[in-house]
A protein has these predicted regions:
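Short glycine/proline- and aromatic-enriched beta-strand/turn motifs that initiate or cap beta-hairpins
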Residues: 18-78, 212
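Transmembrane beta-barrel domains of outer membrane proteins
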Residues: 25, 58-60, 95-97, 141-143, ...
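Residues that define the transmembrane beta-barrel architecture of outer-membrane proteins
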Residues: 29-31, 49-55, 86-90, 114, ...
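Repeated loop/turn-to-beta-strand initiation elements of outer-membrane beta-barrel proteins
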Residues: 32-33, 65-71, 102-106, 146-154, ...
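Transmembrane beta-strands of outer-membrane beta-barrel pores
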Residues: 37-43, 73-79, 98, 112-118, ...
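Outer-membrane beta-barrel translocator domains and adjoining extracellular loop/strand segments
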Residues: 43-50, 80-87, 118-129, 156-157, ...
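Detector for outer-membrane/organellar transmembrane beta-barrel domains
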Residues: 89-91, 95, 99-159
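Outer-membrane beta-barrel "beta-signal"
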Residues: 144, 173-182, 200-213
Length: 213
């Protein structure tokens, strides 16, 4: 009887732990689809300080309570003089999340994909140059819940290709005003190095939509 009583906590505690991880994953809204729309300025002289517009689409799917699969797509547009420069990135990856406590959560992911950079003449709509290269990225981030609706997130990503190397630093706020839909604001700093040239940067702000499932 004593032995059976001692075994009860060993059976119950893992169940409690698993339930807690599942609840935390849902609380932080890990299973979601997001849409970002941003705009910013660049210090590139050859772009005449033109604005940069960014679109982002992606999402996460939890394989277990901690391991996740994610997809990220983004498109950047620049319009210097009579040109349109477009940079597309597509990444498929996976990673691990861990709940520190009921309010703080951290994660890390690694992704593989492709990058396409294309320059088009706006007058003739002809392609001036087009390159497609292998892309890989490492991402680390943290989420902090202020309350049940408000969440602050911080993220660092390093992505590498033969066309451009980029380090991104992002901080954002999300308000989950519905069981499914949330909206937010973000600021993002991009430190870029195009084909071995000197480092340049883009300051970017934007709006985000988050759809939980």
């Amino acid at each position: 009887m004593v032995r059976q009583l001692l075994l009860v906590p060993l059976v119950v505690l893992p169940a409690i732990s698993i339930a807690s991880e599942a609840e935390l994953a849902a609380k932080f809204g890990y299973e979601h689809i997001y849409l970002d729309v941003g705009s910013g300025t660049t210090n590139k002289d050859w772009l005449d300080n033109s604005n940069a517009t960014t679109l982002g689409l992606g999402g996460n799917y939890l394989i277990t309570d901690n391991w996740l699969f994610n997809v990220d797509y983004s498109a950047q547009f620049f319009h210097p003089d009579d040109l349109t420069l477009r940079v597309d990135r597509l990444l498929f990856g996976g990673g691990y999340r861990y709940g520190i406590n009921d309010q703080l959560d951290v994660y890390g992911t690694y992704g593989l994909g492709a990058l396409k950079a294309k320059a088009t003449d706006e007058k003739t709509d002809s392609t001036i140059s087009s390159d497609t290269e292998f892309l890989q990225a490492v991402t680390f981030g943290a989420n902090y819940l202020l309350n049940e609706q408000w969440m602050v997130s911080a993220q660092i990503q390093a992505n590498r290709s033969d066309v451009v190397d980029e380090n991104k630093y992002r901080i954002g706020f999300n308000y989950q005003w519905h069981d499914v839909i949330g909206t937010g604001l973000y600021y993002q700093y991009r430190d870029t190095d195009y084909s071995g040239e000197s480092s340049d940067y883009i300051n970017e702000v934007g709006l985000s939509l988050k759809f939980l499932f």
